[in-house]
Amino acid sequence: MKHFFALLSCILFIFPVFASVDARFIEKESPIYSEIDALYALSSLASPNTNRPWTESQARLYLSKIDSNSLSDEGRAIYEKAKREIEDGLRWEYEDGFSLSGGIMFSNEFYFHTNSDFDTEEEWVRSWNDRKPLIRLWGEVSTGDMFYTAADILYRYGRAAMEDNYGLLKDVMTSDGYIGSYEITAPDNTPYVISSKYFREKYASNFYTNTQNFSFIWPRRAVFSFGGERWNFSFSRDRMKLGKSHIGSLLVDDHSDYADTIRTTFFNKYFTYDWILMPLNVLTSDSEDTTTEGRIYMIHTLDFRIFDRVSLKLSENVVWKYSVFDLGYLNPSFFFHNLNNRSMFNALAYIELNIALTKGVNVYGQYAMDQARAPHEGNGQSDAWGFSVGGEYTFTALKGVFTLYSEYLLTSPLLYRRDGVDFIKVSRYYHQGSDNNTYGHIPFFEYIGYRYGGDTNTIKTGAVFVHPTWGECEGYIQLMEHGDMSIYKSHNIDGKNEDEANIKESTPSGTDVLRAIIISIKGEVSLSSLLSWPGISIYGEADWIGVSTFNKENKTYNDFKTDFQLSLGVSIAI
């Protein structure tokens, strides 16, 4: 009997019967997004919906707009690959519409860098969120086209390790006890990472034996979804990005480990409506506290395909801080800016435009406005905004598709910042430390939108190559300057975050400006054409970073340092 079940398991894994599911979400890391983006560019079409991830029915709809007969041989190969990825769906299909999928992925990664002064995840280009777990066990279930659920179990080291060097939040909070708009409730006990073991060491790996460093934050991906051919409702934990940009989106960016969302989407070939509720953690201490406060980031986006060559996204969004949950505020058709209660709400207006000028040539841009002076309003608060513009050229060569791009991004110092309510999220990671200073929850503060927040000036130029058989690679150069503003710095001239955001400087603010250059190349090669089972891929990333401080008064550079960072890995999926 044991031999029978072993043989049956092998047959199931090697010879799956795939099932299509409309409600299935395609992971944000899937290559299908870059493939369909490239196909749209080659077909003289503006980019498809830039709210990602998509459902299977969305991907099928967007791909159906491509005329494969008009594509070159390389384009048709990419088209067929994307079509297979959509149609494959779940691995096994049974009677009465029941289907399921599952597997296990082993990923062994090695990290090397030359300068141990680059010792936090913020100082690495490929940060903790991008590093793969040693083991990922995942499963998906569907009962017909309309229902889908998925979850994973991870074995990986935590975001904080027992061997890290820690400080206390009392050392980095403002004089009135805040980080951003979050009050620090236990500043004398709650630690933060000053120097990370896994980023400090010159040689490291994702293999570890100290179980005290095990990450309890899983599942990292947990999806409950039901929907049809043109609609979907989901309750999910997954990576998310809203907006087209290689530098980073101003609305919601995918640099975070995950986002918890309740999402409703209606879509067709010409219009997509997204209503997204993103619950935000408000606890900042290391202990297991209760809270009477809650926060939700409420997002609604309207995506219009005005012409085949032009798409426009309009979005109005608000973070709502509440102690009493009032259902009236959830109306997705309301204009959030008219709620007019700054102690409870902070709104962000957003617009995005994508234009296909000709075959292979696209231009695009996004603008976010956090704060602007209205008629009859005082000028006590500073304006807060950001924008990015970019262009792409897509063409076929070397039996694949190249996309060359160049982008510029500028954010004002106080973008995402305000007293009371702001656009910062707090993610707490549980840690089994060996002493009282590191045992419990460790909070990490991040911007929901652009990774580096306000007070930044960034240029990025690069190239992406997608091959239908072997995978894809990317290389780029990024130049950035960052002023004095940070998550830990007060937005108020008196250093009190309970008071209004009134710093009046322009980007880059302060006397000393951080200037950085990044040169990066990364890629992943699939061996599926050589070996159909198990799925094996080899990947790597090499980054060179140069950082210095520029003094605006005396025009001098100081504290120049560099680091070469190398990540190599192999994944085996069964």
Regions found by a protein language model. Give the residues of each.
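Sec-dependent signal peptide recognition
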Residues: 2-10
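N-terminal signal peptide c-region/cleavage motif recognized by signal peptidases
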Residues: 14-16
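C-terminal structured "cap/appendage" subdomains that terminate the fold
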Residues: 512-541
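Outer-membrane beta-barrel "beta-signal"
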Residues: 525, 561-574
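Signature for the C-terminal beta-barrel architecture of outer-membrane proteins
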Residues: 232, 241, 253-441, 454-461, ...
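Outer-membrane beta-barrel channel domains
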Residues: 23, 27, 42-50, 54-311, ...
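Extracellular/periplasm-exposed beta-strand and loop segments of Gram-negative cell-envelope proteins
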Residues: 125-128, 164, 200-212, 419, ...
